[in-house]
Structure formats: C-alpha cells, structure tokens
C-alpha cells in the first residue's frame, strides 16, 4: 500500500500498533498529525462514548479498552474505505456490542467497510455482503440475505457448516 491508498483507507489491524506509553489523548494528537482526514472532535466523542480515561496509558488499560481506542481512532477518519481485521476478537460479548454499535452509528454510508471476523453471529445483523474464504481463496460470496435464503440458514450456520 502506497501513500495514495493510505490517504483514503482507514485500517484497523488485528494487533495494536499503538505504543503502550501512549494515552488516548496522545494517540489522538498522533493521528491528527498523520492523517489530514482525521476528526479529533469525533475521536474525543468516541473516547467519551467508550468511557475511556483520556490520560491513562495504554499499558494500564485492558485489552477491551485498547481495542475501543483503536476503533475510535480509525472510525474518526473521514475515509472512503474502512478495513477492520478482527475488530471484536478477544473482547467480552458486552464490549463487542458496544464496539459494533459505535462503528455502525458513526459509519459514513458513502464509504465501504470490509470487516474480517470469525465471530459471524456477532456481526450477522450488520452484514450486507458476505465473503467466505479458506486458505486465502474465496469459496463463497454473495448478498447476505440471498445466501440465507438459498442455504436456509444464518450466515453463522453457513460458516460453521463450511469450516467443519
């Protein structure tokens, strides 16, 4: 990925890229310096929504709190494409709901979101198109409602059946 791609893509990796000595406030300043499309007011609003202490170091935060901060940062960019790699793995079910609610309520409908996850049941209600992959190869893709209708099961049921 080059500078052009990074200019319109907001990426959440499956592992943190933030230094443990950063605070949410410092991370917001860092993102503001790096990304011209970053909305710091939106980031602070999300930090408040997630009830994150703005001046606590990441090293003193739980995994769920760090995950929420990363989501706040990437969703505070005015990007055209959002890539979220396992955004809710490793956090408890209550935190998953909060994270997904924040993502959906703050998502620009003019943008595209690609979300990779093994937690299909948790994201099924927000998925419009599903792509099932194995060993780096696509083996099934389609409109989520059409897949449910065709296979007479949920996306989670389809996922579980295909990956046995």
Model region roles, listed by residue range:
Residues 96-109:
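Helical segment within the ABC ATPase nucleotide-binding domain
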Residues 13-69:
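ABC-family P-loop ATPase nucleotide-binding domains
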Residues 123-125:
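A short, surface-exposed alpha-helical micro-motif characterized by mixed small hydrophobic
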């Amino acid at each position: 990925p080059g500078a052009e791609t990074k200019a319109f893509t907001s990426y959440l990796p499956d592992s943190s890229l933030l230094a443990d000595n950063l605070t949410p406030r410092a991370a917001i300043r860092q993102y503001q310096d790096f990304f011209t499309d970053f909305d710091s007011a939106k980031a602070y609003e999300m930090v408040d929504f997630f009830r994150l202490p703005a001046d606590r170091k990441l090293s003193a935060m739980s995994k769920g709190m760090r995950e929420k901060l990363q989501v706040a940062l990437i969703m505070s960019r005015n990007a055209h494409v959002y890539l979220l790699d396992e955004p809710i793995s490793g956090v408890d079910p209550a935190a998953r709901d909060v994270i997904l609610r924040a993502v959906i309520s703050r998502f620009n409908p003019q943008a595209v979101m690609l979300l990779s996850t093994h937690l299909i049941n948790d994201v099924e209600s927000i998925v419009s198109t599903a792509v099932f992959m194995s060993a780096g190869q696509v083996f099934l893709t389609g409109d989520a409602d059409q897949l449910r209708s065709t296979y007479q099961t949920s996306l989670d049921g389809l996922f579980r059946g295909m990956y046995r």
